[in-house]
Protein backbone atom coordinates (compact mmCIF):
# COMPACT_ATOMS: atom_id res chain seq x y z
CA UNK A 1 0.00 0.00 0.00
CA UNK A 2 2.74 2.43 0.92
CA UNK A 3 4.51 2.00 -2.42
CA UNK A 4 1.23 2.38 -4.33
CA UNK A 5 0.43 5.55 -2.40
CA UNK A 6 3.88 6.96 -3.13
CA UNK A 7 3.51 6.19 -6.86
CA UNK A 8 0.28 8.17 -6.90
CA UNK A 9 1.83 11.10 -5.07
CA UNK A 10 -0.10 10.55 -1.86
CA UNK A 11 1.66 11.84 1.24
CA UNK A 12 1.07 8.98 3.65
CA UNK A 13 2.08 11.03 6.70
CA UNK A 14 -0.42 13.72 5.75
CA UNK A 15 -3.12 11.11 5.16
CA UNK A 16 -2.50 9.55 8.58
CA UNK A 17 -2.46 12.92 10.35
CA UNK A 18 -5.71 13.97 8.65
CA UNK A 19 -7.38 10.64 9.46
CA UNK A 20 -6.29 10.76 13.11
CA UNK A 21 -7.38 14.36 13.54
CA UNK A 22 -10.80 13.52 12.13
CA UNK A 23 -11.23 10.14 13.88
CA UNK A 24 -10.14 11.47 17.27
CA UNK A 25 -12.03 14.74 16.83
CA UNK A 26 -8.97 16.61 18.08
CA UNK A 27 -9.29 20.15 19.36
CA UNK A 28 -7.61 22.94 17.37
CA UNK A 29 -4.59 23.25 19.67
CA UNK A 30 -3.83 19.53 19.63
CA UNK A 31 -4.28 19.59 15.86
CA UNK A 32 -1.88 22.53 15.56
CA UNK A 33 0.74 20.82 17.71
CA UNK A 34 0.51 17.58 15.71
CA UNK A 35 0.91 19.47 12.45
CA UNK A 36 3.88 21.40 13.86
CA UNK A 37 5.57 18.13 14.81
CA UNK A 38 5.20 17.04 11.20
CA UNK A 39 6.42 20.46 10.00
CA UNK A 40 9.53 20.12 12.16
CA UNK A 41 10.18 16.63 10.79
CA UNK A 42 9.90 17.89 7.19
CA UNK A 43 12.09 20.90 7.99
CA UNK A 44 14.87 18.75 9.46
CA UNK A 45 14.72 16.29 6.57
CA UNK A 46 14.76 19.17 4.08
CA UNK A 47 17.79 20.78 5.68
CA UNK A 48 19.64 17.46 5.59
CA UNK A 49 18.92 17.03 1.87
CA UNK A 50 19.89 20.48 0.56
CA UNK A 51 23.39 19.49 -0.57
CA UNK A 52 22.53 15.87 -1.43
CA UNK A 53 19.24 16.24 -3.31
CA UNK A 54 18.01 19.81 -3.81
CA UNK A 55 14.75 18.69 -5.46
CA UNK A 56 13.75 16.49 -2.53
CA UNK A 57 14.97 19.14 -0.08
CA UNK A 58 12.72 21.64 -1.83
CA UNK A 59 9.67 19.45 -1.40
CA UNK A 60 10.42 18.67 2.25
CA UNK A 61 10.85 22.36 3.00
CA UNK A 62 7.63 23.18 1.16
CA UNK A 63 5.80 20.47 3.11
CA UNK A 64 7.08 22.01 6.34
CA UNK A 65 5.63 25.37 5.30
CA UNK A 66 2.35 23.76 4.25
CA UNK A 67 2.01 22.07 7.64
CA UNK A 68 2.68 25.41 9.36
CA UNK A 69 -0.17 26.98 7.38
CA UNK A 70 -2.50 24.15 8.36
CA UNK A 71 -1.35 24.31 11.99
CA UNK A 72 -1.93 28.04 12.27
CA UNK A 73 -5.26 27.74 10.47
CA UNK A 74 -6.29 25.35 13.25
CA UNK A 75 -4.73 27.51 15.96
CA UNK A 76 -6.58 30.61 14.75
CA UNK A 77 -9.67 28.49 13.97
CA UNK A 78 -10.00 29.99 10.50
CA UNK A 79 -13.46 29.77 8.97
CA UNK A 80 -12.18 28.05 5.82
CA UNK A 81 -11.45 24.92 7.87
CA UNK A 82 -15.13 24.05 7.61
CA UNK A 83 -14.91 23.83 3.80
CA UNK A 84 -11.67 21.88 4.01
CA UNK A 85 -13.29 19.45 6.44
CA UNK A 86 -16.33 18.97 4.22
CA UNK A 87 -14.17 18.26 1.17
CA UNK A 88 -11.63 16.21 3.10
CA UNK A 89 -8.58 17.92 1.63
CA UNK A 90 -6.97 21.31 1.11
CA UNK A 91 -6.92 23.07 -2.26
CA UNK A 92 -4.17 25.43 -3.36
CA UNK A 93 -6.69 28.28 -3.21
CA UNK A 94 -7.53 27.45 0.41
CA UNK A 95 -3.88 27.28 1.36
CA UNK A 96 -3.36 30.68 -0.23
CA UNK A 97 -6.40 32.14 1.53
CA UNK A 98 -5.19 30.74 4.86
CA UNK A 99 -1.76 32.31 4.27
CA UNK A 100 -3.41 35.69 3.67
CA UNK A 101 -5.56 35.43 6.81
CA UNK A 102 -2.65 34.27 8.95
CA UNK A 103 -0.50 37.09 7.58
CA UNK A 104 -3.12 39.61 8.69
CA UNK A 105 -2.62 38.30 12.24
CA UNK A 106 1.14 37.74 12.38
CA UNK A 107 2.57 40.13 9.81
CA UNK A 108 3.52 40.38 6.16
CA UNK A 109 6.65 38.29 6.69
CA UNK A 110 4.36 35.25 6.62
CA UNK A 111 3.22 35.84 3.03
CA UNK A 112 6.83 36.48 2.01
CA UNK A 113 7.96 33.25 3.63
CA UNK A 114 5.11 31.32 2.00
CA UNK A 115 6.10 32.73 -1.40
CA UNK A 116 9.63 31.38 -0.89
CA UNK A 117 8.19 27.99 0.08
CA UNK A 118 5.97 28.03 -3.01
CA UNK A 119 9.03 28.74 -5.19
CA UNK A 120 10.69 25.70 -3.61
CA UNK A 121 7.64 23.58 -4.42
CA UNK A 122 7.28 24.71 -8.03
CA UNK A 123 10.81 25.58 -9.16
CA UNK A 124 12.75 23.39 -6.77
CA UNK A 125 10.66 20.23 -6.81
CA UNK A 126 8.32 20.09 -9.81
CA UNK A 127 10.62 21.83 -12.27
CA UNK A 128 13.86 20.77 -10.53
CA UNK A 129 15.50 24.06 -11.54
CA UNK A 130 16.94 25.12 -8.16
CA UNK A 131 20.40 24.03 -7.09
CA UNK A 132 21.58 23.56 -3.51
CA UNK A 133 22.56 27.23 -3.22
CA UNK A 134 19.13 28.44 -4.33
CA UNK A 135 17.36 26.03 -1.99
CA UNK A 136 19.66 27.01 0.88
CA UNK A 137 18.85 30.70 0.34
CA UNK A 138 15.14 29.97 0.78
CA UNK A 139 15.37 27.54 3.70
CA UNK A 140 15.62 30.26 6.41
CA UNK A 141 12.19 31.58 5.42
CA UNK A 142 10.66 28.18 6.08
CA UNK A 143 12.67 27.87 9.28
CA UNK A 144 11.15 31.13 10.47
CA UNK A 145 7.65 29.89 9.69
CA UNK A 146 8.18 26.79 11.82
CA UNK A 147 9.91 28.68 14.65
CA UNK A 148 7.28 31.43 14.84
CA UNK A 149 4.39 28.97 14.61
CA UNK A 150 5.81 26.99 17.52
CA UNK A 151 6.17 30.21 19.50
CA UNK A 152 2.64 31.36 18.65
CA UNK A 153 0.99 28.09 19.58
CA UNK A 154 2.92 27.83 22.84
CA UNK A 155 2.22 31.42 23.89
CA UNK A 156 -1.50 31.65 23.21
Give the location of each predicted region.
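Short, charged, low-complexity loops and linkers
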Residues: 17-27, 47-51, 98
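Non-transmembrane, amphipathic alpha-helical segments
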Residues: 31, 49, 53-57, 127-130, ...
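Hydrophobic alpha-helical packing segments in soluble, helical-rich domains
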Residues: 54-76
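Long, charged low-complexity segments
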Residues: 73-156
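Short amphipathic alpha-helical segments
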Residues: 1, 8-21
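Generic structural signal for well-ordered, non-membrane alpha-helices
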Residues: 37-44, 63-70, 115-118, 144-147
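Short, positively charged interaction helices/loops
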Residues: 26-48
